[in-house]
Amino acid sequence: MSTERERRSGAPRYAGKDLPMTSHMESMGQFKIIVWEEENFQGKRSEFMMECPNAMERGFRKIRSIKVENGPWIGFEYPEYQGQQFILEKGDYPHWEAWSGNSAYRTENLLSFRTIRCANHNDSRVTLYESENFQGIKFELTDDYPSLQAMGWCSKEVASIKVLSGAWVAYQYPGYRGYQYILERDRQNGEYRKYTDYSSQAHSSQIQSIRRIQH
């Protein structure tokens, strides 16, 4: 993985390199990911420029290494964008530790992935709330915070989040560690009213670090 990432953790539903691209964004090469069935870029290989809701439908038993050439992506543990989610920014992911980072959750392969289209590192704003439904103490952020408590947030919990622009990845623990939650302006209108909106696998509202997604 790159040192930059270490400093921070109507169209067809999917398309491989043999399928036509259907948008200006894709025709400009905005998104491209290469996946392999085995670790260290071995075994069956395919390139994608659009979402893939089920890698098994493309002949893969699993995906165990990845190279992101353009754009940020999200990888999911299960088909149809289910299970734990992992941010995939530009760079090499030769094995599962590369995308899971310091997560306590061991996910050795991925089975679906999609693009993050609203990421804008230079224009990202998010508001954190103490209580559900955007109530209680709030704090607006425009930068990366490896420790929310060091920044002044008084709790280990963030009960609701409103993404005003860009895309963010929130982490369970300080230092961009633990479970990852991808928060996007163009999903759910940027409104995450309770912690179960963060992810289908979110078990609590514990969030202690957050950063902008690179694009």
Predicted regions and their residues:
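Compact beta-sheet-dominated domain cores in extracellular/mature segments
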Residues: M1-H215
